[in-house]
Amino acid sequence: MLKQVEIFTDGSCLGNPGPGGYGAILRYRGHEKTFSAGYTRTTNNRMELMAAIVALEALKEHCEVILSTDSQYVRQGITQWIHNWKKRGWKTADKKPVKNVDLWQRLDAALGQHQIKWEWVKGHAGHPENERCDELARAAAMNPTLEDTGYQVEV
């Protein structure tokens, strides 16, 4: 039987692009571990992706996961768009390169053999864990220490 894990995530950006951060909570049998980090120049979508990636990469064995995010970009990307992106060699329907491909590929790899149920929660609507993740992400964004080497300025 797989371990049942809950993950809650959020990303924040002070300006888009600008300093950003992510926050994540991993819960297993009432025990919680939090994750957060801040980047000097990034985007909100990249931080939303990083929150999910870091939490999933922390899992040491195959798990049954309920992952809650307030990002439709992340939820739709992983449940609907990614399959066609991969078939097209990481291109969109109009043959343009997928944005944030480095993180989408990393998220795809982090899924591993986990059974994941992706849940969308409305942001800033009083969901306790989402609010905590938002606080972690915003605090990290206000004190960025890392460089987002995968961030590319759009021209």
UniProtKB/Swiss-Prot annotation:
Q: Which Pfam families match?
A: RNase_H
Q: Example GO molecular function term? A: RNA-DNA hybrid ribonuclease activity
What does the subunit comment say?
A: Monomer.
Binding positions for Mg(2+) 1 per the UniProt entry = D10, E48, D70
Please give the GO cellular component terms listed in this UniProt entry.
Answer: cytoplasm
- The name on file for this protein is Ribonuclease H
Recorded superkingdom: Bacteria
Q: What organism is the protein native to? A: Escherichia coli O127:H6 (strain E2348/69 / EPEC)
Per UniProt, the keywords (alphabetical) are: Cytoplasm, Endonuclease, Hydrolase, Magnesium, Metal-binding, Nuclease
Could you say which cofactors this protein requires?
Mg(2+)
User: Where is the RNase H type-1 domain positioned along the sequence?
Assistant: 1-142
